[in-house]
C-alpha cells in the first residue's frame, strides 16, 4: 500500500460524500436499503475511532416517486419542489440507519452563498464542529430549495471538497457508481485504462471525463475537479464505488487515490482561492503579474491598469494579467470607486491614508 492510500486508511477525520447513484436502484428509485448499507460501512469506520461527516446527495431523486414524477425534473422550480419533499425522506433514512447504532444525526443544508460569504462560512464551520463535539453525525447537503440558479455543486462533489477543508478533515472519500478514475469512460470504451493513483497533472494527461447521469449531476469531470481541489488544499482523496464502501473505508485498497499537497492550505487562503465569490476584477500590467505571482509580493495601485465590478474593501477580487487570464485572487483593501482613482499611480503620489497595498501579500493566492 502506498503512503497516499495509507493517509486515507489512517485518517482520524473523514468527509464521506455519497452520490445520488449510490442511493438509487438501476431504475432510478431511491433505495433506503442501499443507504442503510452505506451507513453500516460508515459506522464501522466511526466505531474504529474516526470522526465522519457525511455529504449526501439524493434529495431530488428521493422526491421523484412521492410527487408522482416519471423522471428527474429539468426545470429549477420542479427540482426545488422534489428536493423539498425528498430531503425529508433522505434525512429520515439516514436517521433511521444510524439509530440502529444509537447515533443521532443532524441535518446541515448549505448554499453556495453560505460557503462564499466569510461570516456564513465561519458559522457553518462552528455548527459542524459543535455537532461533532456532541457526537452527532452531520448530514450535509446543498440547500436546493433556495438556490437561485441551476444546481451548481456538481452533485455535491465540489461541496464535499469545500466541507472537507471547512471541518479540517484529514481525508475525503467520494462514493458513487464509479469505481475509480479511467482515461476514458469504461462503460463506453473497451480497454479503458484504470488510473490507481494521481500524484500530479502528468497522471491526468489524455484523460477524457464525461458528464453526469440523468439522476445525478456529478459526472467524472465534476469528481476529478473536486478531488483535485481538495488535494491541492492538502486533503487526500479516494474515489471509489459505493459497492466497495466497506473496503474503501476500512483499508482504502480500492478506487483511485489523489495525493495531497505536502503543506495544507490555511483556512483563509483556501476560502480566498476556492470558496469566496469574486466581487470584481483588477487587470494588472506585466510587472505587477511578476511581483504578485512569482515574487509573492503585495499588489500596489501602480500595477493596476483597469478596475471592473462593484466591490468594497474586504471583498475578494480576481486579478488578471494583460491578456485577461486570471492569475490570482485576493482580498482588496479599497472600494472599486476609490481604487479607480488610484490605479497606475505611484505610492508616493498618493495621500498617506491611501498608501496601503491594494491587495496585501498575506491576502493573495495565485491560481
Curated annotation (Swiss-Prot):
Domain called PUA: residue spans: 279-357
State the pathway, as annotated in the record: Amino-acid biosynthesis; L-proline biosynthesis; L-glutamate 5-semialdehyde from L-glutamate: step 1/2
Of the GO CC terms on this record, one is: cytosol
The keyword Nucleotide-binding is assigned to this record? yes
Q: What is the gene name?
A: proB
Can you name this protein?
A: Glutamate 5-kinase
| Job description of the protein | Catalyzes the transfer of a phosphate group to glutamate to form L-glutamate 5-phosphate.
The record lists the organism as Mycobacterium avium (strain 104)
Instruction: Keywords in alphabetical order, please.
Output: Amino-acid biosynthesis, ATP-binding, Cytoplasm, Kinase, Nucleotide-binding, Proline biosynthesis, Transferase
Amino acid at each position: 500500500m502506498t503512503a497516499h492510500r495509507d493517509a486515507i486508511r489512517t485518517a482520524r477525520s473523514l468527509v464521506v460524500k455519497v452520490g445520488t447513484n449510490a442511493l438509487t436502484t438501476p431504475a432510478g428509485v431511491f433505495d433506503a436499503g442501499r443507504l442503510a448499507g452505506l451507513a453500516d460501512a460508515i459506522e464501522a469506520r466511526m466505531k474504529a475511532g474516526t470522526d465522519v461527516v457525511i455529504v449526501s446527495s439524493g434529495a431530488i431523486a428521493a422526491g421523484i416517486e412521492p410527487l408522482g414524477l416519471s423522471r428527474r425534473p429539468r426545470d429549477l422550480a420542479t427540482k426545488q419542489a422534489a428536493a423539498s419533499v425528498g430531503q425529508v425522506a433522505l434525512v429520515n433514512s439516514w436517521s433511521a440507519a444510524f439509530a440502529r447504532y444509537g447515533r443521532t444525526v443532524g441535518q446541515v443544508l448549505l448554499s453556495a452563498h453560505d460557503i462564499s460569504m466569510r461570516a456564513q462560512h465561519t458559522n457553518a464551520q462552528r455548527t459542524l464542529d459543535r455537532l461533532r463535539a456532541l457526537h452527532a453525525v452531520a448530514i450535509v447537503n446543498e440547500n436546493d430549495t433556495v438556490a437561485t440558479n441551476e444546481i451548481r455543486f456538481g452533485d455535491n462533489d465540489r461541496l464535499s471538497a469545500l466541507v472537507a477543508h471547512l471541518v479540517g478533515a484529514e481525508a475525503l472519500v467520494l462514493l458513487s457508481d464509479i469505481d475509480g478514475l479511467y482515461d476514458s469512460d469504461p462503460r463506453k470504451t473497451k480497454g479503458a485504462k484504470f488510473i490507481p493513483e494521481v500524484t500530479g497533472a502528468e497522471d491526468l494527461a489524455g484523460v477524457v471525463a464525461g458528464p453526469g447521469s440523468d439522476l445525478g449531476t456529478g459526472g467524472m469531470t465534476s469528481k476529478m475537479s473536486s478531488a483535485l481541489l481538495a488535494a491541492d488544499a492538502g486533503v487526500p482523496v479516494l474515489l471509489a464505488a459505493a459497492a466497495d464502501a466497506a473496503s474503501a473505508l476500512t483499508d482504502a485498497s480500492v478506487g483511485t487515490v489523489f495525493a495531497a499537497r505536502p503543506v495544507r492550505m490555511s483556512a483563509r487562503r483556501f476560502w480566498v482561492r476556492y470558496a469566496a465569490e469574486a466581487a470584481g476584477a483588477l487587470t494588472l500590467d506585466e510587472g505587477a503579474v511578476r511581483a504578485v505571482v512569482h515574487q509573492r509580493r503585495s499588489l500596489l495601485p501602480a500595477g493596476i491598469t483597469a478596475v471592473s465590478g462593484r466591490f468594497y474593501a474586504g471583498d475578494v477580487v480576481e486579478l488578471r494579467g494583460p491578456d485577461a487570464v486570471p492569475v490570482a485572487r485576493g482580498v482588496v483593501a479599497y472600494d472599486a470607486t476609490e481604487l479607480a482613482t488610484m490605479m497606475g499611480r505611484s505610492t508616493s503620489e498618493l495621500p498617506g491614508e491611501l498608501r496601503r497595498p491594494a491587495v496585501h501579500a498575506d491576502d493573495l493566492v495565485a491560481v
